[in-house]
Amino acid sequence: MSLTLQSLKPQKGARRRKMRKGRGIAAGQGASCGFGMRGQKSRSGRPTRPGFEGGQMPLYRRVPKLKHFTLVNPKRFTVVNVGELAELKAGTVVTRDSLTEAGILTSPKHALKVLGDGELKVKLTVHAAAFTASAREKIEAAGGSCELID
């Protein structure tokens, strides 16, 4: 049998008939229709909204309003100060890997961010994910350049 558009049909057992509730005991879902005996969930109409606790003060109103919250995926940086870059040779291209080889960084796990603490008199080309304004100022004042990378 060839596979054509008109010969396609669902797999055996994939399509089930709609359950007709309240159509007699022999139908399997008669009498209380699978809703149990009595109570709010057995009545007609819309069910209770999510978070409704039967009139009890709900959890979202019992807990205090929190002022601050932590970010789910914060940006993490490996930081280095401009003063630490001063011990590198002039004309060096500074990256996260080159700083690890030089022994300035110990764990290059995250993206590199350059902070502006310390003095710099050496011309460097710095590749980093972020710079503070003072760090960028000091690097460019020494004749170097700052390049943003991802």
From Swiss-Prot:
Extent of Basic residues compositional bias: 12-23
SUPFAM superfamilies for the chain: Ribosomal proteins L15p and L18e
Biased composition (Gly residues): 25-37
Region (Disordered) residue spans: 1-57
One biological process term in Gene Ontology: translation
Gene Ontology cellular component annotations, sorted alphabetically: cytosolic large ribosomal subunit
Source organism superkingdom: Bacteria
Keywords, ordered alphabetically: Ribonucleoprotein, Ribosomal protein, RNA-binding, rRNA-binding
Keyword Transferase set for record: no
Family matches, as InterPro entries: Ribosomal_uL15, Ribosomal_uL15/eL18, Ribosomal_uL15/eL18_sf, Ribosomal_uL15_bac-type, Ribosomal_uL15_CS
GO MF annotations, alphabetized: rRNA binding; structural constituent of ribosome
PANTHER family linked to this entry: 50S RIBOSOMAL PROTEIN L15 (PTHR12934), LARGE RIBOSOMAL SUBUNIT PROTEIN UL15M (PTHR12934:SF11)
Function: Binds to the 23S rRNA.
Subunit structure, as described in the record: Part of the 50S ribosomal subunit.
NCBIfam families hit by this protein: rplO_bact
Family per similarity comment: Belongs to the universal ribosomal protein uL15 family.
Protein name, as recorded: Large ribosomal subunit protein uL15
Biological classification of the source: Bacteria, Bacillati, Cyanobacteriota, Cyanophyceae, Synechococcales
Gene field: rplO
